[in-house]
Structure formats: C-alpha cells, structure tokens
C-alpha cells in the first residue's frame, strides 16, 4: 500500500473541491461509468500495476478511479508541465492513489516525477504503462539503451528538455543496481498510448525492431481521433485563447498550421467564434479538404504578417520560426495545440525581452519594438490556459484506454512487440455507450438489410478499411 505521503501536489486542501468536480464529471462520462458497472465484479485489472502519464485533470481522475475500481494498482503523473488541475491531483492523492503532478512544474520536476512512476510503493515495479505522448515509454527505452552500453546519445541532447531527461537517466544508472532498467522492461506487459505524437514514437520503435513490449494505439480508435481530436479541440481551443487573452475573436484573422483531426477541430473552433481562418498544409489531400471546407490554404510565410492569431496543430517541429514571428503584427497571439512545445521556435525567443502578464501568458518584445503574446510557452494551450476538452468527449477516449489496458493485461502472450489497434467491435461499443446520454435513437438493421450489405445485424457495421 502507498504511504500516507506518497504524493506531490500543490495543495491537498483542494481535495474536496476536486471531489465535487469529479462527481459532476462522472455524470458526463457515461462510457467510463458503464465500464465500471460491467467489469467491477470480475476485476479484470487485478494484479495490474499501472504507471500512468497523462494530463492530471478532473476527467483523468475519473479514468484513474475507473482503473482502480477494476482492480488496478496505480501511480500517476501529468504528461505536461502546465496541464495539471491542482484540485484534481489533490482529490486523487486524498483517495490514496500516489500522484505527482503540479500545474507549472519545472522540466526538472517533471522528469523527476516521471521517474517516481517506476519506483513502486511496494518496492516492486509497474507492469503496465498508460501513456500520453510517450514520455513514460521513452524513459524505459532510453534507460535500457544506456544500461546496455549505448550511452553516447546521453551526451548529445538536442534541446533543454532532452538535457534534463538525459541527466535523469545518467543519475538513475548511478543510483539503481545494474540491470534495473532491464528488469523494468521485462516487467512491463504492455502500453496503451493516447495521442498522435506518442503513437508516432511507438511505430518508429516498432519499425526499427526496438519496441520492448506490445502497444495498443488508442489514438487511432475512431472514437478517439474523430471525437477527442476533432470535437474536443473544437470546444477547447477558443476557450484557452479567450481565457488567456480576453481577445474578441470575431473579425480576427486566424492561421491554423495543420489540417489533420486536431487542425480540423481547431479551424472549426476559430470559425465558429467568428474568425476568418487560414490553413497551412504539406499534405495535398488535407490541403484540398481545407479548401473544400472554405478555408484559405496558404503558407506560414504568407500568413505571418496577415493573421492576428496563430495556432500550430501539426505534430512537427519549427512550424512557426523566429523569422515568422518577426514578421507578425504587434501583439499577435501565438499558441500551440499539438502535444510538444517545439512546433513554435520558443528557444529562439529566450534572449528577447519577456514580460509575464499572468500564468501561462507572456509578452515577448523584439528588437524593433513589436511584440507577440505567447500562450503556455508554446505548450498545449487548451490545457495550459483552460481546462482541456469537456468530460463527455474524454469519456470516449478514456473508455478506449480502459479497454486497451484490459486487453493487454488479460491477454499476456497474445501480442508481439508491435503496435496494435482495438477491434472495430469495441470502437462501436464505445460509441454506443455514449448515445443515450445525448438522446440518440439508433436505427436497427432488419435481417434482410444486414444480409444485403453483408454485415451482422449487431455490427461491426463497417470494414476495417472504412474511413469515417
């Protein structure tokens, strides 16, 4: 059992506030609550020790308590230095679940907390990872690589964050007995990954033959990527910009870099707020989609002096460069809704004059006197400056996460060290669990109709290659 103080939160006194909001969120998360009812008696996660690295929000608290209700033992950190909701972390800590998460952590604290995920409270090790962005997974892979003798990369960090991360790995190698990372890698039975960026890392490891354990790509479940990424961003992006700046959105020109699911939701969010929206894309298919939706598709170079608001949603690096920001209007708003902070060249701004306006809102002045307003230092604006996606859409994502954890834990040995997705039948089940809450009446196929299109009356209703 965890000790009484096996947590780090800003203020444990916020637990009651957090508990009240968790109770409200539960009524908006029908998928997770249905999973609790279905599986509580059978305890499919009994024996699972889940190391969770995912934004420590109110919605995540409902996920954590669902995993616990299904029998799991849990330790948790946030996957972003600004995304923690302190009252949510306090409520989870007060419930006896070890959590290490504070809004506004330093990068050093962030990685120290990540290391605590793997120092289990019974002296053992976790045997499952639930990840968002892949940092917990990378901790195991980088540590084992260095432990096996290939440690040269630790002396070649490519960023401030890598410098801190690699220093942590070096410290762990000194503090832990030889073979600790090997034992950790062997202990982990699988990982379920939440987001596009983390999934990209997993597929890269798998292609190189370096993935240490089976992985389920939760992001590409239809009920995650086509709902959380699209409809979640449609609501939460503008919320973050408004809370950060109080700016009038209507009439402004907004530039969205990237028109994947997150970019589509972001562009819709800005359009619905009255913005005139520009989009940049490298993919001709996505560019054509944006144009057919009525957006002007152009380049960042063209948009830099024109737009009032800039949003990156690409999953790539250096999308907004220092030169782009030099060309922007005075007090243009710059933010990111992709997982990592390197979509905007924030490092190139460090030698300029910074004025902090309020938490996660900075004004940066260039040599010519013009300024930009940077939100959340280029990290996730919807979680850094607001409260993230609404509970209902996160219920679908987190129901997928729970089902993925059950699948990996209860079917050890079934999966190779590759990346898998959940079957379509489970995707449809997740969707079905959310229909009653919003008053949907589903049509039932007759036997002759099902036979005519070659499907079962009860689904799956689409082939695996179908694109929603």
Curated annotation (Swiss-Prot):
Signal sequence coordinates: none
Stated name of the protein: Adenosylhomocysteinase
One GO location term (cellular component): cytosol
Catalyzed reaction equations: S-adenosyl-L-homocysteine + H2O = L-homocysteine + adenosine
Pfam families on file: AdoHcyase, AdoHcyase_NAD
Cofactor: NAD(+)
Binding site for substrate: 57, 132, 194, 224, 228
Pathway: Amino-acid biosynthesis; L-homocysteine biosynthesis; L-homocysteine from S-adenosyl-L-homocysteine: step 1/1
PROSITE patterns in the cross-refs: ADOHCYASE_1, ADOHCYASE_2
Keywords: Cytoplasm, Hydrolase, NAD, One-carbon metabolism
Compartments in which it is found: Cytoplasm
The UniProt record lists the keyword tRNA-binding: no
GO BP term, pick one: one-carbon metabolic process
Any GO molecular function: adenosylhomocysteinase activity
Enzyme Commission code: 3.13.2.1
Free-text remark on how the cofactor is bound: Binds 1 NAD(+) per subunit.
Function: May play a key role in the regulation of the intracellular concentration of adenosylhomocysteine.
Lineage: Bacteria, Pseudomonadati, Pseudomonadota, Alphaproteobacteria, Hyphomicrobiales
InterPro entries documented for this protein: Adenosylhomocyst_ase-like_sf, Adenosylhomocysteinase-like, Ado_hCys_hydrolase_NAD-bd, NAD(P)-bd_dom_sf, S-Ado-L-homoCys_hydrolase_CS
Protein family: Belongs to the adenosylhomocysteinase family.
Binding site for NAD(+): 195-197, 229, 258-263, 281, 316, 337-339, 382
């Amino acid at each position: 059992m965890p000790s009484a103080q096996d947590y780090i939160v800003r203020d444990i006194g916020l637990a009651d506030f957090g508990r009240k909001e968790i109770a409200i969120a539960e009524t908006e998360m029908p998928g997770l609550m249905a999973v609790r009812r279905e599986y509580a008696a059978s305890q499919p996660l009994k024996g699972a020790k889940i190391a969770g690295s995912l934004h420590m929000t109110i919605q995540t608290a409902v996920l954590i308590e669902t995993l616990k209700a299904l029998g799991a033992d849990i330790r948790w950190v946030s996957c972003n230095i600004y995304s923690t909701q302190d009252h949510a972390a306090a409520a989870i800590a007060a419930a006896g679940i070890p959590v290490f998460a504070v809004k506004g952590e330093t990068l050093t604290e962030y990685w120290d907390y990540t290391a605590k995920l793997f120092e289990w409270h019974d002296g053992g090790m976790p045997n499952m990872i639930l990840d968002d962005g892949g940092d917990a997974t990378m901790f195991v892979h980088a540590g084992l690589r260095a432990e096996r003798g290939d440690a040269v990369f630790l002396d070649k960090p490519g960023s401030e964050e890598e410098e801190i991360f690699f220093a942590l790995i070096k410290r762990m190698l000194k503090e832990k007995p030889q073979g600790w990372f090997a034992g950790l890698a062997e202990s982990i039975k699988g990982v379920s990954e939440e987001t596009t960026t983390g999934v990209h890392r997993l597929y890269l490891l798998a292609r190189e033959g370096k993935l240490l354990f089976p992985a389920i790509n939760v992001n590409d479940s239809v009920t995650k990527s086509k709902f959380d990424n699209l409809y979640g961003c449609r609501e939460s992006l503008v919320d973050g910009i408004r809370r950060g700046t109080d700016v009038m959105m209507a009439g402004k020109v907004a530039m969205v870099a990237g028109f994947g699911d997150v970019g589509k939701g972001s562009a819709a969010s800005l359009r619905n707020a009255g913005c005139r929206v520009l989009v940049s894309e490298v993919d001709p298919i996505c560019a054509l989609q944006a144009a057919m939706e009525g957006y002007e598709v152009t380049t960042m170079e063209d948009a830099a002096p024109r737009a009032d608001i800039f949003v990156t949603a690409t999953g790539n690096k250096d999308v907004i460069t220092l030169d782009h920001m030099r060309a922007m209007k005075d007090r243009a708003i710059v933010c990111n809704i992709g997982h990592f902070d390197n979509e905007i060249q924030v490092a190139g701004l460090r030698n300029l004059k910074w004025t902090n306006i309020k938490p996660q809102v900075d004004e940066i002045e260039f040599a010519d006197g013009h300024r930009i307003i940077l939100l959340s230092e280029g990290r996730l604006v919807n979680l850094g400056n607001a409260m993230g996606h609404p509970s209902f859409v996160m219920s679908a994502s987190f129901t997928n996460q729970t089902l993925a954890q059950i699948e990996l834990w209860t079917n050890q040995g079934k999966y190779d060290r590759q990346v898998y997705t959940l079957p379509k039948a489970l995707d449809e089940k997740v969707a079905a669990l959310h229909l009653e809450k919003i008053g949907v009446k589903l049509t039932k196929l007759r036997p002759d109709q099902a036979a005519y299109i070659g499907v079962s009356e009860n689904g799956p209703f689409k082939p695996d290659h179908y694109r929603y």
